């Protein structure tokens, strides 16, 4: 194998694929990236057995071929080479090394046989559709914060993607919850997604797709089956196993009859919660909301350091109510509100609260209260 490639393109592509590779691997080949040269292109592939990323870039191959090299070392070498450099990659099968040349710099990396590199065979994909990159990014950005990190509740360690609604108003819905808060985003169901199975996309996969979308303004191709999902974003193809579990019946925790409505300026509310929570302890993080007609008083009391209160003018016309929330969770949800006004629908101090964007009907959030 002998191939010439521009440093900027190689660095960008390696930046995408090497993130999949774990720093420590008990299986040596999983620490490597598969490099394959073919006439006018170079492809890079990395996997952790659950997730596989392949990217293709322009190159000039004098000799076609393929090999595998340590992913993070390869990335670091390319990153430190001078900008604008033309990089020559040349494999020496007899010595099991890959030579890397750029200007006066010379490196050799030990290789492992390509035949040992695992292939995450996707099999037949039953559904295929496309989303605008901005829509895919919104689905992820507005739900990712609520993904559970508890490994014992593995079925909550991702975003539940499924079709919902009625035939006349069918939606593609993304839901995430950690048991304390829930996020739900709806988009118009794209062609090809009708009848799709409900799938749980793992947290790591979600993060990689999010980063890839930030580099691309085009469309995202999505193919899925019961066991795997594939995202095509520009020259990158990401294939992932799905979480093998049953997502809970989240509809049961979404309040339907909360009769107390609080309407508040999103920026003022977010800033006030942030200010008063400065004094809260890391362990407690509770902020109290005292509601009365036209007024909201936010307060935090920390026995070790003191207290804080702030008053806001709001739209509220129901009976007085005191309720507590985890301040970090409250700030996370407030950050998702895209418009200028947030609407909180409450019932009592022990029941979940529904949070919505006044200007956007496609998103809703649920937050469980805390005792204060």
Q: How does the language model describe each region?
A:
Residues 1-372:
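Structural preference for solvent-exposed beta-strand-turn elements
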């Amino acid at each position: 194998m002998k191939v010439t490639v521009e440093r900027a393109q190689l660095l960008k592509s390696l930046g995408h694929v090497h993130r999949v590779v774990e720093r420590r691997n008990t299986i040596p080949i999983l620490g490597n990236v598969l490099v394959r040269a073919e006439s006018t292109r170079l492809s890079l592939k990395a996997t952790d057995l659950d997730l596989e990323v392949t990217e293709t870039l322009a190159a000039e191959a004098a000799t076609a071929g393929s090999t595998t090299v340590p992913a993070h070392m390869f990335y670091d070498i390319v990153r430190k080479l001078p900008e604008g450099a033309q990089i020559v990659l040349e494999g020496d099968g007899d010595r099991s090394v890959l030579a890397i040349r750029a200007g006066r710099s010379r490196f050799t990396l030990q290789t492992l046989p390509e035949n040992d590199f695992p292939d995450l065979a996707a099999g037949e994909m039953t559904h295929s559709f496309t989303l605008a990159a901005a829509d895919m990014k919104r689905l992820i950005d507005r739900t990712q914060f609520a993904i559970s990190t508890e490994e014992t509740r593995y079925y909550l360690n991702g975003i539940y993607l499924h079709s919902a609604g009625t035939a006349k108003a069918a939606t593609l819905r993304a839901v995430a919850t950690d048991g304390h808060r829930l996020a739900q985003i709806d988009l118009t169901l794209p062609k090809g997604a009708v009848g799709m199975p409900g799938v749980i996309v793992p947290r790591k996969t979600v993060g990689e797709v999010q980063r890839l979308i930030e580099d691309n303004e085009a469309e995202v191709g999505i193919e899925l089956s019961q066991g795997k999902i594939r995202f095509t974003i520009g020259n990158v193809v990401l294939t992932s196993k799905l979480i093998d579990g049953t997502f809970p019946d989240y509809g049961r925790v979404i309040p339907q009859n909360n009769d107390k409505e609080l309407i508040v300026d999103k920026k003022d509310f977010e800033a006030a919660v942030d200010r008063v929570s400065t004094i809260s302890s890391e362990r407690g993080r509770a902020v109290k909301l005292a509601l009365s007609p036209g007024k909201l008083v936010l307060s935090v009391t920390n026995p070790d350091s003191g207290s804080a209160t702030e008053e806001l003018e709001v739209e509220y016309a129901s009976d007085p109510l005191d309720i507590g929330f985890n301040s970090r969770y409250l700030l996370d949800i407030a950050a998702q509100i895209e418009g200028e006004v947030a609407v909180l629908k409450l019932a009592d101090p022990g029941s979940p609260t529904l949070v919505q964007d006044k200007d956007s009907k496609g998103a809703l959030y649920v937050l469980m209260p805390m005792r204060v």
